[in-house]
C-alpha cells in the first residue's frame, strides 16, 4: 500500500474525532492572547498521543509539539492559529458559541482540529518520518498588529526548520478544493492614521476657522486618487479609509479631525510609493488650508505572504493525489504566517469549504460563517502527507 492510500485509510479512523475537537473549540472561542482553554486542550491532546510538548513558547498560550523520526532528515514545521474573533454568532448550529460576542468566524477552530488530526496520523506513521516534525499552535493571528508568530519566532520556534506549511479554511472555494499560488498570495496590511489640526469656531462663521472636517474630505478624495492615478492598474492594490472622527455638536467647527484606514499591497515598491504619495498629499492639502497634520503608519505589520515557487510546484503535485488543486489569485487579506515564510521556504494554502447544499456560503468573518466538516479529514491528511514527504527530502 502506498503512502497516500495508507494515510487515507488511517484518517477514516479519526474523522469523527477531528470533528468533535473542532466543535468543542467552536463552542468555547477565545480572543487573541486569551486562548487558555484552547491551548490546554491542544497540549493535553498532544501528550495523550505521546508527543513531546513545549508550552509558553514566546507567548503564554503558545504550544509546540515535536515528533522525531528514527533517522536523520529535514525539520518540517506545520502551523495552526487558534484565536477567535469579536463576532456574535448568528448561525444555527448545535455547537454554537457559548461566549457572548466571540466566535470562530475565521475557522481557526478547524485549523487546530486539522493539525491535531495530522499529529495523530504522524504518530501512527512515525516510522516513515525522517528528521523532525514541529507542530506550531499559534495564538493571536487575528491581532493584526504584532501578532503571535513574531514572539514565537523570537523564542526560537523556527530554529533549524527547513520547510514550513500552513492551511487556512476558506468559503471562497468549493468544499475539498485546495487553492494556492507561487509567489505573493496575501498582502501586507499597512494601517494608517491621519490627524488634521485646524482651528475651531462657530459653525456660522467658517471663514474664521480652519475647518479640519472640510480639509479631511479633500484629503480623503485625493487619497482615493492614488489607486486610480498613481498605481499601475495591473497591480493588486487597495486603500480604504475606514473611520473618520471629529466634532461634538452641530454648531461647532472642531479643532481636529482623525481618519484611519488600511493600505493593502503585494509588492514592496508599490507599498513604498503609496505611503510616500499619502504623506505628500496630506502635507500639501493641509498646507494649502493652513492646517497642520500627522500621518502615522503602524510599525512592523504583517509582511507580504510569499510562497516559495519551487516548494509550491512540488506541493501542488503532492496535494493533487488527494484532491483537486487550483491556482488562486492573490488575496488582499493579511496573515502573520508570512513571518514564518521569511525564516524558511514553504507554502500557505487554502482549503475550500463552500457547500451550498449545507448552507456553507458565508464569507470568513461573517457571523454566519459555516464550515463543511467533511473537509477536515483532508486538512489532516494534507498536514501528514506534506510532513512525511518533506522530512525525507
Curated annotation (Swiss-Prot):
Pfam family, any one: M20_dimer
Record-linked Gene3D superfamilies: 3.30.70.360, Zn peptidases (3.40.630.10)
Cofactor annotation: Zn(2+)
Keywords, ordered alphabetically: Carboxypeptidase, Hydrolase, Metal-binding, Metalloprotease, Protease, Zinc
Its EC number(s): 3.4.17.-
InterPro entries in UniProt: Amidohydrolase, Bact_exopeptidase_dim_dom, Peptidase_M20, Peptidase_M20_dimer, Thermostable_CP
Name the record gives this protein: Thermostable carboxypeptidase 2
Organism for this UniProt entry: Saccharolobus solfataricus (strain ATCC 35092 / DSM 1617 / JCM 11322 / P2)
Lineage: Archaea, Thermoproteota, Thermoprotei, Sulfolobales, Sulfolobaceae
Gene: cpsA2
Amino acid at each position: 500500500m502506498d503512502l497516500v492510500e495508507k494515510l487515507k485509510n488511517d484518517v477514516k479512523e479519526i474523522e469523527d474525532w477531528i470533528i468533535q475537537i473542532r466543535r468543542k473549540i467552536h463552542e468555547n472561542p477565545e480572543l487573541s492572547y486569551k486562548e487558555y482553554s484552547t491551548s490546554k486542550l491542544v497540549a493535553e491532546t498532544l501528550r495523550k498521543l505521546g508527543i513531546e510538548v513545549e508550552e509558553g513558547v514566546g507567548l503564554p498560550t503558545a504550544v509546540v509539539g515535536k515528533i522525531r523520526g528514527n533517522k536523520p532528515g529535514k525539520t518540517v514545521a506545520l502551523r495552526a492559529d487558534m484565536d477567535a474573533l469579536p463576532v456574535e454568532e448568528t448561525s444555527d448550529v448545535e455547537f454554537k458559541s457559548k461566549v457572548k460576542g466571540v466566535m470562530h468566524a475565521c475557522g481557526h477552530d478547524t485549523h487546530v482540529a486539522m493539525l491535531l488530526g495530522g499529529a495523530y496520523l504522524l504518530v501512527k506513521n512515525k516510522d516513515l518520518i525522517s528528521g523532525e516534525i514541529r507542530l506550531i499552535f499559534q495564538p493571536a493571528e487575528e491581532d493584526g498588529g504584532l501578532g503571535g508568530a513574531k514572539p514565537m519566532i523570537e523564542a526560537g520556534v523556527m530554529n533549524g526548520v527547513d520547510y514550513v506549511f500552513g492551511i487556512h479554511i476558506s468559503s471562497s472555494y468549493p468544499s475539498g478544493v485546495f487553492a494556492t499560488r507561487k509567489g505573493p498570495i496575501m498582502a501586507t496590511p499597512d494601517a494608517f492614521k491621519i490627524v488634521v489640526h485646524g482651528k475651531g469656531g462657530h459653525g456660522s462663521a467658517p471663514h474664521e476657522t480652519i475647518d479640519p472636517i472640510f480639509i479631511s474630505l479633500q484629503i480623503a478624495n485625493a487619497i482615493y486618487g492614488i489607486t486610480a492615478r498613481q498605481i499601475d492598474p495591473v497591480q493588486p492594490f487597495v486603500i480604504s479609509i475606514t473611520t473618520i472622527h471629529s466634532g461634538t455638536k452641530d454648531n461647532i467647527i472642531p479643532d481636529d479631525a482623525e481618519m484611519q484606514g488600511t493600505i493593502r499591497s503585494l509588492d514592496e515598491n508599490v507599498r513604498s510609493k503609496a505611503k510616500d504619495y499619502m504623506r505628500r498629499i496630506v502635507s500639501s492639502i493641509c498646507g494649502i488650508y493652513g492646517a497642520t497634520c500627522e500621518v502615522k503608519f503602524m510599525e512592523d505589520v504583517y509582511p507580504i505572504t510569499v510562497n516559495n515557487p519551487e516548494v509550491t510546484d512540488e506541493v501542488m503535485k503532492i496535494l493533487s493525489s488527494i484532491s483537486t488543486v487550483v491556482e488562486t489569485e492573490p488575496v488582499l487579506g493579511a496573515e502573520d504566517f508570512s513571518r514564518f515564510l521569511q525564516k524558511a521556504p514553504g507554502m500557505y494554502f487554502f482549503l475550500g469549504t463552500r457547500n451550498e447544499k449545507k448552507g456553507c456560503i458565508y464569507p470568513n468573518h461573517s457571523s454566519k460563517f459555516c464550515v463543511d466538516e467533511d473537509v477536515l479529514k483532508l486538512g489532516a491528511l494534507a498536514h501528514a502527507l506534506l510532513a512525511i514527504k518533506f522530512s525525507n527530502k
